[in-house]
């Protein structure tokens, strides 16, 4: 039987960033091959650093998918744990070591007997940086294994052990990276009339773009436009030629995200025209679409967990953070949910360390749900 705690600790020590999860993939394949030995209804494929494990059903009517992410973050770990990261500057600070371990535990249970329906376990790379789910889908990695329904979870530090939280609509917002560069004309600070100050134009843009959310977004829906980087100039007495802004757009629906993206671009171009200068606007959403749960499937999952002993189900509001499972859920109906890990430190914090008792709870809960879906 798989030692969940040791497996998690092994994985925790080898975090790797997206599409570089070579040790992680090797470790996972070793475990998967041991678990699936002698199971003639199992097939395994790899895609770059990702893994797909397909359990052929005995009388399949559909394919049920379970997705886990496998990448770490470029963070220096500060937990002080004896099994801390052995990779300098890399850490499993978002709980993907837990996600992988739970998926392996569920795979082990699913292999106890051939399921009626097909089951697909997806070990997806590059959730954090390259939207690996989108890359796999667009590259045809699923082939005829593409699920009819897709499920997944994410650990959440501010929920207690035994709590599961989701809803029947949006769980994560869609995110879009924004880069804007204004280009004017540099010059001496004493002669502003001979220059065209990009810093002034960029500053004007930052104030004007605030109207996008306040005047273009339905207040019931909500959206966020934040610029966290503003770079302009190198010294006090020189008017800068260029100004660079780097920010993010977040919205509950893809339609709203596209509207906000359009308005941000329009405001930037309008400001540039008003100041008679050039502007470059780069909008990069990629696969980070809103994670929109299928209402009927979410209701089914919520009812299932609500009746499970030891589980407290919470109907939760959307999170303004992003998650690339949204892309796959834009192609396949499915549900994502939160699993409580009761940590005082937030996701992506260098001291984030979940409670390991969650592993057994997660495996028991998820495997029982997948068993139900596989038998329908």
UniProtKB/Swiss-Prot annotation:
Q: Which CDD domains match?
A: M20_Acy1_YkuR-like
* EC number from the UniProt entry: 3.5.1.47
Annotated GO molecular function terms are:
N-acetyldiaminopimelate deacetylase activity
Q: What class of enzyme is it?
A: hydrolase
Is Cell membrane one of the keywords UniProt gives this record? no
User: Which reaction equation describes what this protein catalyses?
Assistant: N-acetyl-(2S,6S)-2,6-diaminopimelate + H2O = (2S,6S)-2,6-diaminopimelate + acetate
Q: Name one Pfam family in it.
A: Peptidase_M20
Keywords linked to the UniProt accession: Amino-acid biosynthesis, Diaminopimelate biosynthesis, Hydrolase, Lysine biosynthesis
Top-level taxon in the UniProt lineage? Bacteria
Give the pathway annotation: Amino-acid biosynthesis; L-lysine biosynthesis via DAP pathway; LL-2,6-diaminopimelate from (S)-tetrahydrodipicolinate (acetylase route): step 3/3
GO terms classed as biological process: diaminopimelate biosynthetic process; lysine biosynthetic process via diaminopimelate
Q: Catalytic site residues?
A: 69, 128
Question: What is this protein for, i.e. what is its function?
Answer: Catalyzes the conversion of N-acetyl-diaminopimelate to diaminopimelate and acetate.
Q: Which NCBIfam families match?
A: amidohydrolases
Q: Which family does it belong to?
A: Belongs to the peptidase M20A family. N-acetyldiaminopimelate deacetylase subfamily.
Please state what the protein is called.
Answer: N-acetyldiaminopimelate deacetylase
List the lineage, top down. Answer: Bacteria, Bacillati, Bacillota, Bacilli, Lactobacillales
